[in-house]
């Protein structure tokens, strides 16, 4: 846990809960990890398992199609094991129901047979910890959400945290990187470790081809230009989203369905991948009527702000 960079508050809360559960020799409370893709939810799930000294069983919401799929996993868990369900918000509601008694009472009811002769059998489970990961906690049903004792909202990472992650990853990748280059790479990574590591690998490719021993700031700048990533970390699709809101919908408001259709990507991609960072960075704002482009978005794209549009600010 101490080696995990970033998410300081979450690490403290988890560390306290894990230590207490180990003293009591009880299963850790169920944990829900919430945040945009690439912030380390899966990594945290594995760290929880490692800190508890138990096994982790990994699955995802979309592939759990029948109650029997969940029952098969639950009955194979040992005391204190961690069951990690990624994209838990995409789990079938009928499948979700079997988790209610499993999470609360460590029991499940299985229906044997069909028709009038069918009977229900209650099976006791070993105490376990369910760790769910979601990019959209609002899509979880209230009964499921309420059964999580620990709900952790992951934040975007700071430049300093990302640069440390990049420097550590560079050692693993057997490549040297200058401090300034790591900081620049961090600034273009949208506050997301997964993106930072992906960009580092692309810069490493150029370093390999050119036979350079160390990655410098000029190499990072060149790769960012090739990838179309600007100083704010926005790529072509980010800018297309902003430009569409401004030019097609006169700055907004616009609903996610209309915006997705205009840009040519799915609603989920807008909501889960692009919108969180654009909101966090102040390029868009969300109102009850839809998304609107902010003055920062106009300035970033070099588009003249309509007279009177932001006068109230």
Curated annotation (Swiss-Prot):
DNA binds at residues 286, 291. Mg(2+) binds at residue 42. Residues 231-313 are annotated as: Head domain (RuvB-H). Residues 1-157 are annotated as: Large ATPase domain (RuvB-L). It comes from the Bacteria. Transmembrane segments: none annotated. ATP binds at residues 38, 41-43, 104-106, 147, 157, 194. Residues 158-228 are annotated as: Small ATPAse domain (RuvB-S). GO terms for molecular function: ATP binding; ATP hydrolysis activity; four-way junction DNA binding; four-way junction helicase activity. SUPFAM superfamilies: P-loop containing nucleoside triphosphate hydrolases, Winged helix' DNA-binding domain. GO terms for cellular component: cytoplasm; Holliday junction resolvase complex. Its EC number is 3.6.4.-. Keywords: ATP-binding, Cytoplasm, DNA damage, DNA recombination, DNA repair, DNA-binding, Hydrolase, Nucleotide-binding. GO terms for biological process: DNA recombination; DNA repair. The RuvA-RuvB-RuvC complex processes Holliday junction (HJ) DNA during genetic recombination and DNA repair, while the RuvA-RuvB complex plays an important role in the rescue of blocked DNA replication forks via replication fork reversal (RFR). RuvA specifically binds to HJ cruciform DNA, conferring on it an open structure. The RuvB hexamer acts as an ATP-dependent pump, pulling dsDNA into and through the RuvAB complex. RuvB forms 2 homohexamers on either side of HJ DNA bound by 1 or 2 RuvA tetramers; 4 subunits per hexamer contact DNA at a time. This is Holliday junction branch migration complex subunit RuvB. It comes from Thermosipho melanesiensis (strain DSM 12029 / CIP 104789 / BI429). The lineage of its organism: Bacteria, Thermotogati, Thermotogota, Thermotogae, Thermotogales.
